[in-house]
Amino acid sequence: MNFEKYAAKGNLFIKELAQELGEPDNRAKAGRVLKAVLKALRNRLSHEESMHLLAQLPMCIKALYVDGWKLTQSPEKIRSVEEFIEEVRKHDVPRGELDFADKEQALKAVKAVFRVIKRHISDGEAQDVEAELPRQLKELWEDA
C-alpha cells in the first residue's frame, strides 16, 4: 500500500474543492463541507449505488464517505433541496450554520462538492447517481 499516494490524491481533491468554494487557502472548511455533503448524499442513495460511487472515489475520500455509516439504515426520503441542505448542516456539527449560513451559500457549497465529485467519477457513474435522486436534487446535480 502506498499511503503517500492515497494522501496526495485526497489532498488534491480537497484542494480542488477549496478552489471551487472560492477559498483556496481554507482547506479545513473544504474538508468539513465535503464530509457533510458526502454523508447527506450517502444517506440519500441506495447502498448498492453508494458502493458503486465509493469504488470511484480516492481512498482518503472514501474514508470520509463511510465514516459513521450504518448499513442497516435505509436511505433517507429527502425530496427537496431544502431537506438536503438541512441534512448537510446536520452533518457539519458544530459549524453547519457558518459553513452553510444561508440557502445561497449552501447551494454554492453543495454544487462545488458535486462538481468535484463528478470530475473524479465516470460519466456513467454520474448518471447512475443522478438517476437515484429526486427531481429537485437531480437538477442540483445536473447544474453542478
Question: Where do the language-model regions lie?
Answer:
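Short, low-complexity cationic-aromatic patches
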Residues: 24-36, 42-51, 100-112, 116-131
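Short, solvent-exposed interaction modules
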Residues: 65, 69-121
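Short, flexible domain-boundary/linker segments around small modular repeats
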Residues: 6-26, 30-39, 80-99
